[in-house]
UniProtKB/Swiss-Prot annotation:
Other facts: Could be the homolog of prtC from strain EC16.
The species this protein was found in: Dickeya chrysanthemi
SUPFAM superfamilies: beta-Roll (SSF51120), Metalloproteases ('zincins'), catalytic domain (SSF55486)
Gene transcribed to yield this protein: prtA
Reaction equation(s) it catalyzes: Preferential cleavage of bonds with hydrophobic residues in P1'
Cofactors (names): Ca(2+); Zn(2+)
Name of the protein in question: Serralysin A
């Protein structure tokens, strides 16, 4: 699904500054555009697909070398003893209960994305992916310098093994410290065939491309702040936007994941902790993979000003963080619920339901027959093209407050000739506002062509004033 406005010659329109509300919509739709030959600060920008290729550049999986999109039934094991790690580290400690529980959650987060199954084995049975702790380096000294490491799939004895430094607090308590959970997900990524996005290790080296940060990949070592994000010291628990493309390149997309109607955020029914907000203090950092159904972003419990974009591949600012929520390619999220701040909600080409909630919100439905609720506060409903609300399938604005809310048509007034009329004359640039008293609905029509047939219609519950309620 293409981003609304992306194929239009809208840069010139943006320079005209149609309105501040339109500018807000434009800025979010063009937030972190990537690929297409862009170079930022001397680094090439990679598309999601190119980044996925880069992260899996060794082209290895548990199906062998250069085998792509093939499912795998894998086993995993929590080691009970080990003389040393493949790197020679010693002082083995088996996983504690918190580590076991968090490792299983991390495994599930990968299985949700791709055609991978994980079965636990014990005893003398071999496993594809194993887990163990160490405490001392190869010289026998207590090791406080490393966090963890893992090995790619293969036929060697080290292949798929993952190792964790038990001297590190977040490793011992990944249930209480976010970086410990992120480390588990990161190392499992290696054991499945994912590399770091660049040719570096343990913080040494430089990123290869612009999007090599934790905003886009849990396999990255670089802060999200390098690409304009801000997680306020929090860390992702599950794979991020580019990781989804990477793991699906190797094993294929899991098309059985969340095929029903799913809610992300508050009132979540995902059964995944990183998709679930239980209070306004919960920091959500996630990228959505979803195989079907009708889906909702519910960020109603936050009082921060939020920017929510439902287009695939997009980034949203949620709960006081920046660029912390994204949507994978091929995923359609139909609905969004804002909080009590001044939120910006942007739909996609599906039939969206957008609810602004309290605050002075801006709603842009984009294509499709959308149902829009501004909520309390002074809300603005933005339209940028006649295709945003067609006569055959119009938008509905369902809680418009006359004299308070606004309908912003300024982006359609490119020739400064948009004007209200009592009936269409056959000239372009005409707006007709019709009140249907029997249904208590105002019908807004636009005719931009030189004929008497409107190309655009919005249905508004309640009576609307052409002098008080429009930005033209």
């Amino acid at each position: 699904m293409e981003k609304n406005l992306s194929s239009r010659d809208d840069d010139a329109l943006h320079s005209l500054s149609a309105s501040s509300s339109y500018d807000s919509v434009y800025d979010l739709l063009h937030y972190h555009e990537r690929g297409n030959g862009l170079t930022i600060n001397g680094k090439p920008s990679y598309s999601i697909e190119d980044a996925g290729d880069q992260i899996t550049r060794d082209n290895v999986s548990w199906n062998g070398s250069n085998v792509f999109g093939k499912s795998a039934n894998l086993t995993f094991k929590f080691l009970q003893s080990a003389r040393s790690t493949p790197d020679g580290d010693t002082g083995f400690v088996k996983f504690n209960a918190a580590q076991v529980a968090q490792a299983k959650l991390a495994l599930q987060s990968w299985a949700d994305l791709a055609n991978i199954t994980f079965t636990e084995v014990t005893g003398n049975q071999s496993a594809n992916v194993t887990f163990g702790n160490y405490t001392r380096d190869s010289s026998g000294r207590l090791d406080y310098g490393t966090q963890a490491y893992a090995y790619l799939p293969g036929s060697g004895s080290a292949s798929g093994t993952t190792w964790y430094n038990y001297n590190v607090d977040n490793i011992r308590s990944p249930d209480k410290m976010e970086y410990g959970r992120q480390t588990l997900t990161h190392e499992i990524g290696h054991a499945l065939g994912l590399n770091h996005p660049g040719d570096y290790n343990a913080g040494e080296g430089n990123p290869t491309y612009r999007e090599d940060t934790r905003q886009f990949s849990i396999m990255s070592y670089w802060s999200e702040k390098n690409t304009g994000g801000d997680f306020k010291g929090h860390y992702a628990a599950g794979p991020m936007l580019d990781d989804i493309d990477a793991i699906q390149r190797l094993y294929g997309a899991n098309m059985t994941t969340r095929t029903g109607d799913t809610v992300y955020g508050f009132n979540s029914n995902t059964d995944r902790d990183f998709y679930t907000a239980t209070s306004s203090s919960k920091a959500l950092i996630f990228s959505v993979w979803d195989a079907g159904g009708k889906h909702t972003f519910d960020f109603s419990g936050y009082s921060n000003n939020q920017r929510i974009n439902l287009n695939e591949g997009s980034l949203s600012d949620v709960g006081g963080l920046k660029g912390n929520v994204s949507i994978a390619h091929g995923v359609t999220i139909e609905n969004a619920i804002g909080g009590s701040g001044n939120d910006l909600l942007i739909g996609n080409n599906a039939d969206n339901i957008l609810r602004g909630g309290a605050g002075d919100d801006i709603l842009y439905g984009g294509g499709g027959a959308d149902r829009l609720y501004g909520g309390s506060g002074r809300d603005t409903f933005v339209y940028t093209a006649v295709s945003d609300s067609k006569v055959a399938a119009p938008d509905w604005i369902l809680d418009f407050q006359t004299g308070v809310d606004k309908i912003d048509l300024s982006a359609l007034n490119t020739g400064n000739n948009l004007h209200f009329v009592n009936q269409f004359s056959g000239s372009g640039g005409e707006i007709l506002l019709n009140w249907d008293s029997s249904a208590s609905v105002s019908n807004l029509y636009l005719n931009l062509d030189n004929n008497t047939s409107p190309e655009f219609q919005v249905k508004i519950v309640g009576q609307v004033s052409q002098t008080a309620d429009f930005v033209v």
